[in-house]
Regions:
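Conserved residues at beta->alpha junctions
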Residues: 162, 190, 214, 263-264
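Hydrophobic residues at beta-strand termini and immediately following loops
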Residues: 115, 213, 260
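Conserved ATP-driven motor cores of ASCE-family P-loop NTPases powering translocation/secretion/packaging/pilus
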Residues: 174-256
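P-loop NTPase motor domains
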Residues: 1-183, 199, 236, 240, ...
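Short, surface-exposed, polar/charged, turn-prone segments marking secondary-structure boundaries
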Residues: 141-145, 185-188, 213-216, 238-241, ...
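Conserved P-loop NTPase motor module
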Residues: 33, 40-49, 72-76, 105, ...
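Short amphipathic C-terminal alpha-helix that caps PH/PH-like domains
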Residues: 130-138, 223, 227, 264
Length: 335
């Protein structure tokens, strides 16, 4: 994500920024832009840094930059992170010091986690970045199962639709290493060209079960090689609806490729809206807090809330003073 504009200077500044915030209790992603723009906030954070290399970056490098070069250096970060944080939905999620959703707990207890990453709601880049962050979090929490005995690890199934939108190195790690931690990955996408080359190689090099429905001729050439001699490119191109070719991995050995029929979408089935509403309501009560509360906390943390509160107090004092003057005037008139 942002690979086309990701340079060594951007990475250097962003890395030291994040390492600095990690040493500050209660820090969030909102601190990335603030530490680069708010000098008082930056001094407060730097004073608590214990890592000499990170501290040296701010004292001996960043603070000694000329303003012109400093603006040039931080502008790409402010642009990219600012775009991400400008969405109220995302800002309210990543602007909280502690998440109310524990993915490791969900994995160990067999909970269901559904994430809506609709591009229409949060934008394409934001959807990709947030999705990549969540998938990486699943990967890290799966790897943390190293402190569990293998027999105690429960299978957890991660389903990712249109996974090319979130394709990062995490996929390669999950496919090659996370299976021993019982994180099972199911991915779906429309055509191979959507995947970066390294991700494509990791997918076809590590995936156990491969299912293909009707594809274009370019994809058919590649996928038919994965299925072996039994399936030719025209077979994949000419498939009808609700049919597929499938290859399984059984006892670490690939099965013979076979064709299968799938079920079409059920007709006339209406979703139970009342039950859906109940599930959402219970989930909100158990795992979330009111949006207004979160936004007020973020406002106060940013310093804007304090200014607004101070302005309100000033107005209140001025109003009270006017009332006192008016009251005194009335008394004089009565006399």
């Amino acid at each position: 994500i942002y690979a086309e504009s990701w340079g060594p200077r951007l990475e250097h500044i962003l890395r030291n920024t994040i390492l600095s915030l990690l040493e500050s209790q209660g820090a969030t992603m909102l601190g990335i832009t603030r530490i680069l723009q708010d000098e008082d906030f930056r001094k407060k954070i730097v004073s608590k840094i214990t890592d000499p290399i990170v501290k040296s970056f701010w004292v001996n490098e960043f603070d000694k930059m000329q303003d012109k070069f400093k603006i040039e250096a931080i502008s790409p970060i402010l642009n990219k992170v600012g775009q991400f944080l400008s969405s109220p939905i995302i800002r309210n999620m990543v602007g909280q010091p502690k998440s109310s959703v524990d993915l490791r707990f969900a994995m160990d207890k067999g909970k269901i986690v559904i994430v809506n990453l609709s591009k229409g709601r949060i934008g394409e880049d934001n959807s990709s970045l947030l999705g990549a962050m969540i998938i990486t979090k699943f990967q890290l929490d799966a790897m943390s199962r190293a402190n569990q005995k293998e027999k105690d690890r429960k299978d957890f199934y991660l389903y990712v639709d249109e996974f090319q939108n979130f394709a990062t190195d995490s996929f390669s790690t999950i496919l090659s290493e996370a299976r021993k931690y019982k994180l099972n990955l199911t991915m779906a996408n429309q055509y191979i060209a959507q995947m970066p080359e390294e991700v494509r190689d990791a997918v076809f090099g590590n995936v156990g079960t491969l299912i293909s429905m009707q594809v274009g001729f370019d994809d058919a050439e590649y996928i038919s090689q994965q299925f072996g001699e039994e399936v030719l490119p025209p077979d994949l191109v000419g498939m009808s609806k609700y049919t597929a070719y499938m290859r399984l991995l059984i006892d670490n050995m690939p099965s013979k490729t076979f064709s299968m029929d799938t079920l079409p979408p059920p007709l006339g089935r209406v979703a139970n809206e009342e039950r859906s509403d109940t599930v959402r309501k219970v989930a909100r009560e158990r795992y979330s807090q009111k949006r207004s509360v979160v936004e007020e906390k973020i406002m106060r943390w940013s310093g804007v809330g304090e200014e607004r509160l101070g302005a309100k107090n000033t107005v209140a004092k001025n109003t009270a003073a006017k009332n006192v003057v008016a009251s005194s005037t009335v008394k004089k008139i009565k006399k």
